[in-house]
From Swiss-Prot:
Top-level taxonomy: Bacteria, Pseudomonadati, Campylobacterota, Epsilonproteobacteria, Campylobacterales
Molecular function terms from GO: 4 iron, 4 sulfur cluster binding; cyclic pyranopterin monophosphate synthase activity; GTP 3',8'-cyclase activity; GTP binding; metal ion binding; S-adenosyl-L-methionine binding
Source domain of life: Bacteria
Protein name: GTP 3',8-cyclase
Biochemical pathway: Cofactor biosynthesis; molybdopterin biosynthesis
């Protein structure tokens, strides 16, 4: 069992396999010159897997593959199969924009993937284009349909932005209702890599939009999830709200993150990280385990909003979210 320096059980590892993405979403990585990590600096699947085995052997039972856009990494299904074959009962999920799912969903399912978290910020082609800076909606919807068709579990994430897609909260939620998919509204998190003009909706504003049509009741958080859940009285549908500015989910935080070049990150809201790259490149399991232990010991107790270090509008970290998968 993995325990951090504040007595929390850590059993969830998020693994970024690439920082690259085929979208340029305004809240994450809008058009600008990027200093991509050279391909030769990325850890191989075998190197990533060596560390993941250490983590799984010591208590990790939930893994999410992220990016960037993870489906851009070649032979991702073989990596999924490595993980599944090593620990078939692992809760294995992937975060994606769904653009490449029409041609990859079946392979991912066959490899052992269980669930997908998919970003869907608009059902209007022109708004989806505005956010992603690419004509994406038709392909994304096909990807969602394909994922459901092959039997993958699906959750939808939406980032409501003022003046852009804030009038679609009910539309996107009802799209999910019709397909028995859970939606989670994610409050926009300020960062230096997003467009400066963006303004996100606060959690209470998102809930107010839902209340314009439905009666809702709070359910609370499920386990260590950062999502605060609600149910709709009229039909029993459940949805979630991830509101890092207001809801203190740090006390039950159970996750750490590994980047594609081997940095182990204890908290998304801080820059601190340690590299496991040297250890896994030489196959040193003991050293990799020691790095993991150090990161757990130094994992912050609370995020920086809760500590009062940040005021509204300030960024959480200089590290781009596309480097860590959020």
């Amino acid at each position: 069992m993995l325990i951090d320096g504040h007595g929390r059980t850590v059993d969830y590892l998020r693994v970024s396999v690439t920082e690259r993405c085929n979208f340029r979403c305004q809240y994450c990585m809008p058009e600008k010159p990027f200093s991509w990590v050279p391909k030769e600096n990325l850890l191989s699947f075998e190197e990533l897997f060596l560390f993941m085995k250490v983590a799984m052997d010591e208590g990790v039972n939930k893994i999410r593959i992220t990016g960037g856009e993870p489906l851009l990494r070649e032979d991702l299904d073989s990596f999924i199969k490595m993980i599944h074959d090593y620990k078939p009962d692992i809760d294995l999920a992937l975060t994606t924009n769904a653009y490449l799912l029409p041609q990859t969903a079946q392979k991912l399912k066959d490899a052992g993937l269980k669930r997908l978290n998919i970003s869907l910020d608009s059902l209007k082609p022109e708004v989806a284009h505005q956010i992603a800076q690419k004509d994406v909606l038709g392909q994304v919807l096909k990807g969602i349909d394909k994922a459901l068709e092959v039997g993958l579990g699906v959750k939808i994430n939406m980032v409501p932005l003022k003046g852009i897609n804030d009038n679609e909260i009910l539309d996107v939620m009802e799209y999910c209702m019709d397909r028995n998919i859970k939606i989670r509204f994610i409050e926009y998190m300020e960062n230096r890599h997003a467009l400066e003009a963006l303004k996100g909706m606060h959690g209470k504003e998102i809930l107010s939009k839902v209340k314009e049509k439905y009666t809702i009741h709070a359910l609370g958080r499920e386990g260590a999830s950062p999502s605060f859940n609600y149910t709709i009285e009229e039909n029993g549908y459940e949805f979630g709200l991830i509101d890092p500015h207001k809801h203190d989910f740090c006390e039950s935080c159970n996750r750490i993150r590994l980047t594609a070049e081997g940095f182990l990150i204890p908290c998304l809201y801080f820059d601190e990280a340690l590299s496991i790259a040297e250890a896994v490149k030489k196959g040193d399991i003991e050293e990799a385990s020691q790095v993991l232990a150090t990161v757990l010991k130094d994992k912050p107790k609370e995020n920086r909003w809760i500590e009062g270090e940040l005021e509204e509008g300030q960024e959480v970290s200089s590290r781009a979210f596309y480097e860590t998968g959020g």
